[in-house]
């Protein structure tokens, strides 16, 4: 896992926080049952947004997996929408007029994630905490907030990234 985090943070080793398990807090819009749920159908959008904003696509995919399980129509009980579960104010600020549109949502979410990575000097754990709990909470606690949900969220993303790196290594070895 450390190698994966090092790759995502420009070579710096980030120590993972002590965390509890994450909770999943989203509802699936009824229309989602008709939707194709193959995550690879979003690869081109993710790759394009990742390249544009300089964010590792593995990190973006892990965030999407944790946030919505690649359901572009996911809506949380608090109003977060789409693949990257953007809150209405963030969606508006980052140009996602329709946060349930996969492309608008991913581009806005990746830009927001890029801004958080810049704010925290490439520290992926702090950027993820900011994405989950908001930058105000990260500033107030001078680090990852002691919220169970946020600590679980950061750990979940780190585990998804590490799992993706392991799966890629296995696939490469099989080729």
Which sequence ranges carry the predicted segments?
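Solvent-exposed coil/turn segments that connect beta secondary-structure elements
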Residues: 66-69, 89-91, 162
């Amino acid at each position: 896992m450390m190698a994966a985090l090092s790759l995502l943070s420009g070579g710096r080793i980030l120590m993972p926080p002590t965390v509890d398990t994450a909770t999943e807090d989203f509802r699936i819009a009824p229309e989602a049952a008709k939707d194709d749920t193959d995550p690879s159908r979003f690869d081109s959008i993710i790759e394009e947004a990742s390249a544009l904003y300089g964010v590792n696509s593995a990190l973006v995919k892990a965030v999407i997996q944790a946030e919505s399980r690649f359901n572009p129509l996911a809506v949380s009980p608090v109003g977060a929408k789409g693949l990257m579960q953007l809150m209405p104010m963030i969606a508006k600020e980052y140009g996602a007029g329709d946060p349930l549109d996969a492309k608008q949502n991913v581009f806005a979410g990746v830009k927001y994630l890029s801004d958080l990575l810049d704010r925290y000097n490439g520290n992926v754990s702090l950027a993820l905490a900011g994405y989950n709990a908001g930058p105000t909470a990260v500033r107030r606690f001078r680090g990852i907030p002691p919220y169970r949900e946020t600590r679980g969220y950061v750990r979940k993303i780190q585990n998804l990234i590490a799992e993706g790196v392991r799966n890629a290594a296995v696939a490469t070895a099989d080729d």
